[in-house]
Amino acid sequence: MVHVRFAPSPTGYLHVGNARIAVANALFALRYSGKFTLRLDDTDLERSRDEYAEAIAQDLRWMGIEWADTFRQRDNMDRYEAAADALKASGRLYPCFESEEELRYKRELRLKQGRAPVYDRAMLKMTPEQRAQAEANGKRPYWRFLLSDRTVGWRDGVLGPRQVKLQAISDPVVIRADGTPLYTFTSVVDDIATGVTHIIRGEDHISNSGVQTDLFEALGKVAPALAHLPLLMDADGGKLSKRIDSLTLRSLARDGIEPVALVSYLARLGSSRDPQPLTLAELAQEFDLDAFSASSARFDGSQLAALNRRTLQTMPFSAVQDRLPQGATEAFWEAVRGNLDMLAEARLWWDVVAGSIVPPVLTDEDNALLKQALPLLPQEPWDTTTWSVWTRAVKEASDRSGRALFRPLRLALTGEEHGPELAALLPLMGAERVRTRLTLTSGAMAG
């Protein structure tokens, strides 16, 4: 069975870049009736916070993503210790004692010599006696993984054939001096323990994947299938910063972006398919890693906003009823949804049809038109034909047409230059409110 995982670090709020990876994993699991696990990579105890862990879970649920299993890495220290012991016994983990200053000096020296700043494995040459002496002097070792002297290759699910030359990479530190295991190591151990079959993540993990493939094999396992999505860029082709608060899911939700719109946008971003407002189930039916380009994708806020508008236009009343102003009806929603950039704007139009507006100040000529229009209002009950019946009568009486006719009426009735069709709004407003607004506006002083 397909088993994927989404593994954020709870050191901040979920950003669109990570959210895209979560969406890809969730859709892949749905597409193949597989399992989706939420793993919190929280071994960095200093930076990880419970509030971020909870926020990540909330944001995923907001997008409609559910998981079959979830766990925190901090709860699996025994698992990592056992794996580390096995690697130490096989000679693949070795202790190191160099300070950051010593390592920096070595890197600078190699660069001056025209050599790649790869760790020189000097600690492999230490004798047991030298190690014992270092520890006796108060030094605590950190541990590196001894990489194989080879090139690791795989067929990437998005990028195609990929290779990583392990000889060109420093042996990674996998356990700090304080005993804390690091991501490169813990991720592999957890993927083995939980039976992950596919790893879908960003292309910034390409080198990690080479190293981790070697780690899988050192632990006697075959690495899962790998797929790396190209990183997101901003609309201008620059790097998309994870530090921009406006691109966290929390901020996007506050700004009125609908979860369906965001998921639909992220699901197809960088692929050959245009985004459409679809449910997770609908997106999963056609989800295919082969559809993604190997080139970087651009996250364009204006495109997301446009998709948000389209999403609102397709949402039924039942999906938004609880978030509309109290008393709002299905007829109201049908009338206004085509004019909304975000759902919160429905409040403005509810005030128009059921509340009050500030009377606009019009010219004397426009006020005269309103006075002509007032007695021509049809008798109730009103329906969607009332507007055309009324304006036809006003046109004949005033000899006005087009913008000269419709603009003063719209301003007087709604206080806005543009908006939903007045044929739909007029029956919702009712005759009494319409008469009151025409009277108040036409009696206002012209500017």
Swiss-Prot record:
Chain positions of motif 'KMSKS' region: 239-243
GO cellular component, one term: cytoplasm
E.C. number(s) listed in UniProt: 6.1.1.17
Record flagged with keyword Aminoacyl-tRNA synthetase: yes
Residues spanned by motif 'HIGH' region: 8-18
Gene3D superfamilies: 1.10.10.350, HUPs
Gene Ontology biological process terms from the UniProt entry: glutamyl-tRNA aminoacylation
Compartments (UniProt record): Cytoplasm
Catalysed reactions listed for this entry: tRNA(Glu) + L-glutamate + ATP = L-glutamyl-tRNA(Glu) + AMP + diphosphate
Pfam families: Anticodon_2, tRNA-synt_1c
Keywords in alphabetical order: Aminoacyl-tRNA synthetase, ATP-binding, Cytoplasm, Ligase, Nucleotide-binding, Protein biosynthesis
Example of a GO MF term: glutamate-tRNA ligase activity
UniProt binding sites for ATP: 242
Main location: cytoplasm
Top EC category: ligase
PANTHER family found in the cross-reference section: GLUTAMATE--TRNA LIGASE, GLUTAMATE--TRNA LIGASE, MITOCHONDRIAL-RELATED
NCBIfam families: gltX_bact (TIGR00464)
Family: Belongs to the class-I aminoacyl-tRNA synthetase family. Glutamate--tRNA ligase type 1 subfamily.
Role according to the record: Catalyzes the attachment of glutamate to tRNA(Glu) in a two-step reaction: glutamate is first activated by ATP to form Glu-AMP and then transferred to the acceptor end of tRNA(Glu).
Oligomeric form and interacting partners: Monomer.
Name of the protein in its database record: Glutamate--tRNA ligase 2
Species of the source: Granulibacter bethesdensis (strain ATCC BAA-1260 / CGDNIH1)
Lineage: Bacteria, Pseudomonadati, Pseudomonadota, Alphaproteobacteria, Acetobacterales
